Amino acid sequence: MGKTGGTSFRVFIESNVKKHYFGYGKTHVLTHEDLDIRDPSKFTELEPKGHSVFEHFDLFSEHAPWGLHRYLKTKEYQYITMLREPVSRTISAYRYAMDRGWINEDKNIIDWFHEKENKDKKHYQINYCSGVSIDAPLEIKLDKALINLKSENFLFGLTSKYNEFVDLCCLVNDWKPQYRRINITKAKKEISKDDRKELEELLLDEINFYEEAVNIYNKKYKKVTI
């Protein structure tokens, strides 16, 4: 998922898996949460080697929802992701869009949030963890997302406990750790208290989901000695 673990986490995973496939812009058409974008037939247009990649590679790395396992031959698969406090994640996505020049610096974060192309932001992590259509009722998406988080095929951590999750991944998969370095970044656009408060209201479903995910994380991995 975008703006959770970052490039550091992807590099950590790829350093531990010999045959990794960075399918950015390719595999998402198989599982995209927006059914207007999800189009499995498009994958063979984007990937010259077609579905044979699912038999060759051991890691598929991209911002894509739950569901890619349906295209794998093996039944032994593992989803790995990190979850982030929703307001913090949304602000990070907004600043990233600004840094990339996708929006002007005078664009208010609330106005940006309500733009049509950002309709996924309200339930962003719920959508990704559920693999259900973005337009499905919240109850269906939420139930599926929580079921997936509890699955043994889903290894997840929290951005706030980054190094702890790296250790967990290493313990579960017998990997070598690679911890995040402290980055020095340029000054960031400040978000007003009023805008933060409004984001909390807009992201209430995501916040409730995140809090439940934290509870699942604590119960699921409490017996794991790190």
Per-region residue spans from a language model:
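Glycine-rich phosphate-binding P-loop
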Residues: 1-10
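A residue-level signal for conserved active-site and pocket-lining positions in enzyme catalytic cores
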Residues: 5, 85, 169, 206, ...
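Short, hydrophobic alpha-helix immediately C-terminal to the catalytic nucleophile
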Residues: 10-14, 167
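Hydrophobic residues on the short alpha-helix immediately C-terminal to a glycine-rich phosphate/catalytic loop
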Residues: 12-13, 172, 213
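Short Gly/aromatic-enriched secondary-structure transition segments
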Residues: 13-16, 96
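Post-Walker A helix-loop "phosphate-sensing" segment adjacent to the P-loop in P-loop NTPases
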Residues: 16-22
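PAPS-dependent sulfotransferase catalytic domain
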Residues: 23, 29-82, 87-179
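PAPS-dependent sulfotransferase catalytic core
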Residues: 34-37, 45, 62-66, 131, ...
